[in-house]
Amino acid sequence: MKKIFLGISLLLCAALCACAPREKVVIILSTNDIHAQIQNFPQLATAVAECRDTASVILVDAGDRWTGNAYVDQAEGRRPVLELMNELGYDVATLGNHEFDVGQQTLAEAIDYCRFPVICANMVSENSPIPQLKPYVILDREGEKFAFVAAVTNYGYNNHPDGHDAIFEGLRFTDAVQTLEEYEYLRDSCQVLVALTHIGSKYDRELADEASEYDLIIGGHSHERINEVEDGVLITQTGRNLNMVGVTEVRLRGKEIRSLSFRLVPLADYAPDPVYQEMVETYRNNPVLKEKAGELTATADKVGVANIFLQALKRKSGSDVAFYHYGGIRRDSLSKGDLTRSDIYDLDPFISSVS
């Protein structure tokens, strides 16, 4: 009798285990503020391929894909970075403030060129060649729904992204945090709700405090390396210039998120993918940008680079004193020896002019 009872118990236990939902793992790989620094794309390609071999992957970008490297910024339509992203199979991206640097027509063409959706909930296209973008996408992985809602900063001058007023004519931007709050209803349509933002860490934290339905905020704009939890919401960011890739591991069982964790992975840890390495070398094969434009007698750190820039500004303008905002100096150092046209461009990739 005891053997029969034990046998029935084991059968019931096996049946219950068979009915229990299995744990599913999805990896979200994220980049932000690449700023045209495509030299690490071959390493990123290796990292993405290795991850896809072992898990279901979603690959996303949080804006500012260009402005910072002459080999991209001087190319037609800033295509090199977009071609690399298309080839790598990004799943979704949002706009950063520097996406608008190229002008609205070029940006509209760039969005059309992307083989992945570019989304933004708080940009309203009223009289612009830029189309009205979708506010969100819902992606399926492992039979589960992942909703991504996006917003760009409107916290610059005149309630638009940082940049000159003229490049935003015909566009209107609603408050990013308030707009993202309006999409909390998507919680009913997905297992994981993600805000893909280019608003900076201050406003990401505000969003986490105000919109508790979000599970995850993948941010950009403030160029920080962030891995923190604010009011139960995981906030992440990878810094800038594609030195790191963000790895968010989502573990699901049934309708429940069992765990959500993030780590930053240095791309220097990976060997370059030869196909992407060849693509990057092709983009960098621009003889005009390699021409000598000057010479440095000593290596300059960022302060030294800023002084060189300001001396040129002072001389060109004929002024007694020159000022420039520190964040606009985009080279942290210059090495002793020849300076190329590319080096000069990279000092200030915003195409500023002095009259």
Predicted features by range, described:
Residues 19-277, 302-312, 322:
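Acidic, metal/ion-coordinating pockets
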Residues 6-10, 18-23, 35, 51-54, ...:
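Non-catalytic terminal accessory segments
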